[in-house]
Amino acid sequence: MTSAVITSETKPWYLNRWSQLVLALIAMMSISSPQYVWTLFTGPLNAKLGTTLAELQWTFSLLIILQTWCSPLQAYLVDRFGPRLLISIGALMSGGGWVLSSYVDNVWALYLTYGVICGFGTGIIYVGLIGLMVRWFPDRRGLATGLAAAGYGFGAIFTSFPIDSMIKSSGYAHTLVVWGFIQGIIGILAAQGLRTPPDGWLPAGYSPAAASTAQAKRSYTPREMLQSPVFWLLFVMMSMMATSGLMVVSNVGPFANEYKVGQALVLGMAALPLSLTLSRLTNGLTRPFFGWVSDHIGREATMALAFSLECVAILILFAFIDRPALFVVLTGLVFFGWGEIFSLFPATLTDTFGSTYAATNYGFLYIAQGVGSILGGPAAAYLHQNTGSWTAVFIVVAFLDALTALLAITALRSMRQKHFAKG
């Protein structure tokens, strides 16, 4: 791989970086269903396998664990063997895991097919594509990673209703086979055009020295990155934001039920499903939006702005949570202040440690999402169980948001400036 700086767009068409972004978006959308429509399969799977819901939900936990805690290995494989091959393998595992899940007759087999195989496959695609986008877009890292990450959430918007309809008309097993083939084929086809830009590649007219966001003068290996205090501060900050967000994400339904707003009508729809739909939309839109903002005003300032927005939104939500219309609007605003972590943190990481090992380096940082998935839901449940109300949960979420915003404009900004000064 050459280290020469290339200052013109690479041809053929599929090596144009905007084509790469479109292909990444398609591949991301193809893997969103295993996570976001899992809840549609729990009822029929529970009836078929004769297991408890708690045992069945370990499938979902394994899916998330394999997506996040294995991300350094998944990202290393993408860096080592290239995105075309590995994204194809990831799509094959994701789609194949669904097809195999249609044949299982016990929960342990489901753990393997849906949890392990699907989880590892979707993890390869997610961290691999984020790592690829930060390399193709050194001048628009926030926007590019935001758009790619948004695809992961938006894909389920197009699949939820047809999958739900097919389960009701044809059964869950037939649905898993059909949609397993669909998502696998789409992902494999999109992967065929994916390529890594040459080391040192730059878009025409772009100069790192003139960029509005500070850039590393060289690329750091994963070993070097793990020895840097800046990485560990980013890891702690992302863990705190992932935890705070997932404390809310996992409990929107219980919030609505306890405060008796879930079935109240807002614009002719029940407040709970309307709030979930709006939240999914805002959770996707915030990723490219704040990514784009960070490309212009800087990463730390954007983090402080977005995290403060979630802090304020969660406090206002707590104050007016028993009002259905405000419940819908404010839950959407909370998600708008949270989802951008999936664009701001990878962009900041690559700015700081360079692009050559971008996928592998982000794989280590993405473990923070796994930390949040383990801590967020259980921590919220523990606080509610031991205090008898959701007050403590809202206070903890607001505190984590405010603390992370403060760290962004104080410790992170100062430490990154010293890091860049050392070269």
Spans of model-derived segments:
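Hydrophobic core of transmembrane alpha-helices in multi-pass small-molecule transporters
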Residues: 29, 97, 109-124, 239, ...
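Extracytoplasmic gate region of multi-pass secondary transporters
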Residues: 38-42, 223-290
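Interfacial helix-cap and linker-helix signal at transmembrane-aqueous boundaries
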Residues: 45-46, 77-78, 158-170, 256-257, ...
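Conserved MFS/SLC helix-loop-helix module at the cytosolic interface between two early adjacent transmembrane helices
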Residues: 69-107, 294-300
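Intracellular juxtamembrane helix-capping segments at the cytosolic ends
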Residues: 123-137, 145, 340-353
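Helix-loop-helix hairpin linking two adjacent transmembrane segments in secondary transporters
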Residues: 152-199
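C-terminal transmembrane helical hairpin of 12-TM major facilitator-type secondary transporters
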Residues: 271-282, 288-348
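A late C-terminal transmembrane helix in Major Facilitator Superfamily
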Residues: 352-387
